[in-house]
């Protein structure tokens, strides 16, 4: 929208800064801007870049910026951070994971996008994109499906098996009909089989069960960033239990048996949930234990197509220092 950027080009400082960014020459800083002016400036400076990353200091502020910047770019998405405290579950559960997976899908598909995130989310080590790509399932009308094998694959991908699909992250298999509610989609998919061959694929409304659209092919993205085989799951829990035992012993030696009992109980509940129901929501913040090859979020962008914008550089810098000192994230 040139009508929005035209006033900016009348500023010599903007023109100079834009030229430097376009050539990839160093960093540009602007001060004395109000919040609305900052977003206007970001919009102008980001012209020509297909991946725009706006970094702020908190999830609350990220959501505010995401809502405001949607005026400039409808492709704006918020990438929320995960809880940094070891063993603690994501309080937002599936909704938070869904937001993150939608952003990762946009990056995998190399779509133009503006991502609003926080310093902690940017630095958080997680499963590399290659690990997510290898788990994406593709179906078309030439596909054949082993229902038992597919069920095991979907559980590893973080999906929950249920009698009937009602919300994102669930799947059901019954009588040659496979329903999967992809975490990145608005409507679930229904795959109908003839024997083990795909006969039809369609999306449907979860409430009315009526068809929305007939499809030739679909891709099913993981419902979690933490996809674990049984062997990796067992190895991770063995390491957690060993560390928990040492920590509980230390707490009891310090005269705090109640805290020791709480941590042991919490770990036991998380393990039982993962074993019995295939739930990995409570394991997301323990990625560092289960995934040995990790990558920070900032590595997921294409270098020549990306541009970072720090909405409060001094606060973000202090946040980065805090994260490095307390959690060892570079």
Which residues fall in each region the model found?
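ASCE RecA-like P-loop NTPase motor cores
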Residues: 1-330
